[in-house]
């Protein structure tokens, strides 16, 4: 495995704000230039606003991280003007197979009917997604400030003042609204003394991205108790450029630093692939986390993406839900900033995306309990469901290798009204 290198790097440029005698006021400041922050910035720019986008780094990292982007997210990317290159680069798929030991129990098709504009899912490394979004943001003239690290925030209902550290020193800016899209470890969350409520699971998983020529079909394959990884689970996905994502369950007491060493990872992959030639591209270890902030709006600061909520990777609900946060928030911020709607509209972001987060956490928790049973009774239920699924289609709905990401209907939203037979406007 070669040394990590940035996928892309960007120049730090001094902002005129840094020479101003007083903090400059911006309508919206977005903290974090990942998929969520970039999506929101593009959305706002397309609506005529001029957000400032701050990121403490100056590069896109090499790790693929999120890879699975759902139909709804692709529809959002299409509206933002970035779907075309993503579809061209990504690997489209809609069929999955579930195995136990060496036997295929069943397969499923996520988009059996024809005529859809977007595929059910594409697999595309997060660094490609970010690069396409950055290209679009630059084309729109968005004020994207690299190496601008927020180190303090003075937050109230009327706006916020951010203190920002740069290679040229510290400066301040003000914003009517600040959106924290700064990831799972969110410094913004820490600065506001906010914490997650939820659960961190004991089981660990190894992610390995390997480069190889393989004849596997472009499908999602999930194994329970495979012969090459006895008593655990495994996931296989194809990515662009002959890269394959492999997730391997590890024991709760596994030494993460030891397990990520190439000398330890390679034998595990070899047991799975046999004598196939492959190169390790990227390795990481993670634990399932299903947690969120109690509320996503705090004064003038609004949280989105992993800064607001975390779920396990199985089901592809992390990055997808974050982009959908941005989609929900963008038009509401635009209406409020234009004066066309009262500030109260922003409370619906909190209620609607809290509903989505709760649904994602519920599904992720259920998937985790099925994949890694924590009690003898859970294991008995899982094994019974797997045994029945071989021959009984009704039992397959109980098999949970990660319920895949779906849009949230917002049935409980304050913006939803009952259907009526007649409508006064025609």
Model-inferred region functions:
Residues 1-31, 42, 46-47, 100-103, ...:
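Helical substrate-recognition/capping region of FAD-dependent monooxygenase/halogenase enzymes
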Residues 7-9, 89, 242, 256-321, ...:
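FAD/FMN-dependent oxidoreductases across multiple families
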Residues 24-26, 168-177:
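Core beta-strand elements of the Rossmann-like FAD/NAD(P) dinucleotide-binding domain
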Residues 33-42, 46-48, 133, 180, ...:
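Conserved mid-domain beta->alpha element of the FAD-binding
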Residues 45-65:
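Glycine-rich FAD pyrophosphate-binding loop
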Residues 62-140:
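Active-site-adjacent segment of FAD-dependent monooxygenases/related oxidoreductases
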Residues 135, 142, 177, 181-290:
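Conserved FAD-binding catalytic core of PHBH/FMO-like flavoproteins
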Residues 146-161, 284:
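A conserved short coil-to-beta-strand element within the FAD-binding core of flavoproteins
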């Amino acid at each position: 495995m070669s040394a990590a290198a940035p996928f892309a790097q960007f120049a730090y440029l001094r902002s005129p704000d840094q020479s101003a005698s007083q903090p400059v006021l911006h309508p919206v400041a977005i903290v974090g230039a990942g998929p969520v922050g970039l999506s929101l910035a593009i959305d706002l720019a397309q609506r005529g606003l001029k957000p400032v986008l701050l990121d403490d780094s100056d590069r896109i990292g090499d790790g693929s991280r999120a890879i699975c982007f759902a139909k709804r997210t692709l529809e959002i990317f299409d509206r933002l003007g970035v779907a075309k290159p993503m579809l061209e680069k990504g690997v489209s798929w809609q069929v999955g197979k579930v195995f136990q030991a060496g036997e295929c129990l069943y397969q499923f098709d996520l988009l059996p009917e024809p005529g859809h504009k977007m595929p059910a899912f594409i697999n595309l490394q997060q660094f490609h997604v970010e690069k396409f979004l950055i290209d679009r943001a630059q084309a729109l003239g968005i004020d994207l400030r690299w190496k601008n690290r927020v180190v303090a925030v003075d937050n109230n209902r009327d706006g916020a003042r951010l203190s920002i550290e740069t290679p040229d020193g510290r400066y301040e800016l003000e914003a009517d609204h600040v959106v924290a899209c700064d990831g799972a470890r969110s410094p913004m969350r820490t600065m506001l003394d906010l914490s997650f409520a939820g659960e961190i699971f004991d089981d660990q998983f190894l992610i390995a991205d390997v480069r190889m020529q393989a004849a596997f079909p472009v499908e999602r394959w999930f194994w329970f108790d495979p012969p090459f990884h006895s008593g655990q689970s495994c996931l296989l996905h194809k990515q662009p450029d002959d890269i394959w994502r492999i997730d391997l369950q590890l024991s709760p007491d596994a030494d993460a630093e030891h397990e990520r060493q190439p000398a330890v990872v390679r034998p595990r992959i070899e047991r799975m692939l046999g004598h196939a030639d492959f190169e390790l591209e990227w390795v990481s270890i993670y634990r399932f986390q299903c947690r969120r902030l109690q509320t996503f709006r705090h004064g003038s600061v609004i949280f989105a993406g992993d800064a607001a909520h975390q779920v396990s990777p199985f089901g592809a609900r992390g990055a997808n839900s974050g982009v959908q946060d941005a989609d929900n928030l963008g038009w509401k911020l635009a209406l409020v900033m234009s004066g066309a709607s009262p500030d109260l509209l922003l409370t619906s972001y909190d209620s609607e995306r809290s509903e989505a987060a709760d649904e994602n956490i519920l599904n992720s928790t259920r998937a985790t309990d099925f994949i890694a049973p924590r009690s003898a009774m859970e294991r008995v239920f899982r094994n019974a469901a797997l045994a029945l699924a071989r021959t009984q289609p009704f039992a397959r709905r109980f098999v949970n290798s990660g319920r895949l990401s779906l849009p949230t209907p917002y049935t409980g939203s304050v913006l939803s009204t009952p259907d009526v037979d007649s409508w006064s406007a025609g």
